[in-house]
Amino acid sequence: METSILGYYLFDREEHGLINALNWNKENKSLLKHPDIKDRKTIWTLLKAKGITSNNLQPRDLVDSALSEYIYKDSHQIAYKDTEELNEIVSDSSVLDNRFNFIYYPNIDISAHVFGVGSDQWHEEVGIFEMFIKNLNSTQSKKMYTLITADHGLTNISNENRIHLDYEEDVVVYGDQRSVYINGDETKVKKIFKNVPGRFLNSVEIRHLIGEPTNNLNKRLYPDHCFLVDDGYIIFPKHLKANLVGYHGGITEEEMRVPVIEIINF
């Protein structure tokens, strides 16, 4: 709640409407500098205050994006084009020595989205990642702390369990496709979701799930309702058309599991 980024898609009631939180545009990225959150401290801010320098390595197309500038504020961002270039970067001891290093490695996550968990392409990416870890372990400097992650777990969704919703403009469906936010009249919303396997959350349950809105920006982005889609199902709001194989955003154990590799050498 303190970040105001409540899901994959947000909805600003006052000005910007629907917002893709992964891809802010020229018009809506000003929200990330809103007075309610502009002084928010990140973990990188805390490390910097303690005199601990930190590196944040991530794909080149993510570096300097509005979202990266927001969530990685006060970290030193290093871009890499592909796994080969990442290997070259981490082989340079001057990059990693005596620092806290965070590496975001999304290739496995992307292959799971596009081809599915357990697919040949997914296994291939896992193998490439294993070789990268072996290389990192063999070339690491004497003093380093490195944390590597690749988003969180996914679940494959069969074609027959993909539900396309039909609704009028006075209802807004956003958030994630398995943990759905909705704005609009409750009776209308329940009718729209009546054939979707899952659970409708009331306002009290929503606050237990994502917390209380604590400032004006939170209130602008806070949903009226939430619907948790059952395991194995997914919904498609009107603004999303892409058919992937693997999805996450739900509350199953496999989706909430965050893969993390920790390397300590000092």
Segment roles from a protein language model:
Residues M1-F266:
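Feature captures the catalytic ectodomains and active-site-proximal regions of enzymes
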